Regions:
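Carboxylate-rich, polar loop motifs that coordinate divalent cations or form catalytic acidic clusters
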Residues: 2-363
Length: 363
């Protein structure tokens, strides 16, 4: 992972936490990041749990990278600055990041929401008092959770928060309103609903689309009305991993095993070709400033360009290392960043790849 000090001259869909993959991530003690110390560098083999899972460009041109063990990193184009629980961050397990209309950074963590105004962090835990409520149809409860996996701020200023087990919440700055708590799979061991939300997006009309990774399908929220889309036509399995809106207003939805669906406002179309067979795990979608569609996969060759109705693997020096990619994002210079498991963080300038994966640093 990106394991290092407060400032560095060098240094990535999330690896699903808690109920999404049946594993519980626990906080681990971290060394203080307050002071620079003399150190040597040696190679370090990162494990699968060392994940750089989100990349985000803020309004000032800074890049933010969230991780599953090392908190958050801010990159100003020259140096990386690391924020952990030692600095007030609510948790070192961070799955989502967004900048609000006022320039405040918001993080989705294993301890709920966490806001940062440039000076201090504020924790906004998810509501726990409604967890005991049960479905009016089945009489069964939903899974309790504190973990945020996805986060956006809608055009009306409200936040939409996806959790790892309890569906989604709408947050207006004061009150959380629960959605889709009783969708998704029932855990066979205890008959409790488990709805893991990895993706939330707002379309051009202001409608909210919420994707479930635990077989809850795709939900479209228009005002107070909810429409469910199964996305099962022989390709998909109802596990929505990512969502994206391109410059034409088309929506893209990536699934765990069913490739990508494109929605033009009227029809869902499953996009498949002979290169992928339609059965590839999609983790992230991006349209760059040139109009090129990029797709990341958590399996096989990790990065593709979508050109002429075909997925073309990125094939340059170093690209064979781009496997199990969790996100793709673009910086203010037009460089494309990729990140994922085993601490991977790479930047592509249109010509070559540069590895920003951090080596282990020892005092």
């Amino acid at each position: 992972m990106i394991k290092q000090l407060k400032y560095l001259l060098i240094i990535s869909i999330p690896l699903f936490t808690s109920s999404c993959n049946g594993q519980i991530n626990k906080e681990t003690d971290k060394q203080s990041t307050e002071k620079l110390v003399t150190e040597k560098i040696e190679p370090y083999k990162y494990g699968a749990g060392d994940v750089v899972n989100r990349g985000y460009l803020d309004k000032s041109g800074n890049m933010w990278f969230t991780t599953l063990k090392e908190g958050v990193f801010k990159y100003d184009g020259k140096m990386f600055k690391n924020f952990t629980v030692k600095d007030g961050l609510c948790s070192n397990i961070v799955n989502a990041v967004v900048e609000d209309k006022n320039g405040i950074m918001w993080f989705g963590t294993a301890k709920g929401l966490c806001s940062y105004d440039g000076e201090s962090f504020i924790n906004i835990p998810l509501p726990q008092e409604d967890i005991q409520s049960v479905s009016s149809e089945t009489g069964l409860p939903s899974r309790k959770t504190e973990t945020v996996l996805s986060l956006i701020q809608a055009s009306n200023g409200e936040f939409w928060v996806g959790t790892d087990a309890s569906g989604a919440y709408r947050y207006d700055g004061k009150t959380f309103t629960s959605f889709l708590k009783f969708k998704g799979r029932l855990q066979p061991d205890d008959n409790v609903y488990n709805n893991c939300i990895l993706s939330i997006i707002e379309d051009e009309k202001g409608n909210i689309w919420i994707g479930s990774f635990t077989h809850g399908g795709l939900s479209e929220i228009v005002g107070d009305n909810i429409t469910h889309h199964a996305l099962k036509d022989g390709y998909g399995d109802g596990m929505i991993a990512t969502s994206y809106m391109d410059n034409k207003g088309n929506l893209w939805f990536g699934t765990r095993n069913g490739g990508i669906y494109q929605y033009d406002g009227n029809t869902f179309k499953n996009i498949a070709d002979t290169n992928t067979g339609g059965q590839i795990a999609m983790a992230s979608v991006l349209e760059d400033r040139k109009g090129t569609i990029w797709v990341a996969s958590f399996a096989r060759k990790g990065v593709y360009r979508y050109e002429n109705k075909s997925f073309i693997p990125l094939d340059i020096k170093g690209s064979e290392k781009l496997n199990d990619i969790k996100f793709i994002t673009e910086d203010k210079q037009g460089n494309i960043w990729f990140g994922g498991r085993y601490g991977l963080l790479w930047r592509y300038d249109g010509d070559k790849l540069k590895d920003f994966t951090q080596l282990k640093r020892i005092k």
